[in-house]
Regions:
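Hydrophobic beta-sheet segments that form the core/acyl-binding groove
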Residues: 82-114
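Hot-dog-fold acyl-thioester-processing enzymes
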Residues: 1-82
Length: 114
């Protein structure tokens, strides 16, 4: 399967432009991310343990969400000319397997000096 990133230039994007991704979080994604990252913390991979410490189920890795953000930036907005230099994330609520999650990105400012 080929993946095609949008080829937006700075002239193609404007403040207020947005992109959105909604996905169904799967156990397979969580397992694959644990393998890729090496993060096998039982909060992420052991539902019984996560439940025993107060969560409804195993908790999705925060950086799995961050990876989805990276994919949205690099593939859609702005696309292949994007280089992510800084990212600040907060997780006010846990995300669990089988949840539907939506990420929405919006351009708030454009810096032409890069």
């Amino acid at each position: 399967m080929k993946h095609h990133a949008k080829d937006n230039t700075i002239a193609d994007v404007a403040v207020g432009d947005s992109a959105e991704l909604t996905w169904h979080v799967t156990h397979e994604e969580i397992s694959a991310f644990a393998a890729l990252s090496g993060d096998y913390n039982p909060l992420h991979v052991d539902p019984k343990y996560a439940f025993s410490v107060g969560f409804n189920a195993q908790v999705v890795h925060g950086f799995l969400v961050g990876a989805k953000i990276s994919g949205l930036l690099g593939m859609q907005l702005p696309g292949r000319r994007c280089l992510l230099l800084d990212q600040s994330l907060s997780y006010p609520n846990p995300l669990y397997p089988d949840d539907r999650a939506t990420i929405r990105l919006e351009i708030q400012s454009i810096h032409e000096d890069m």
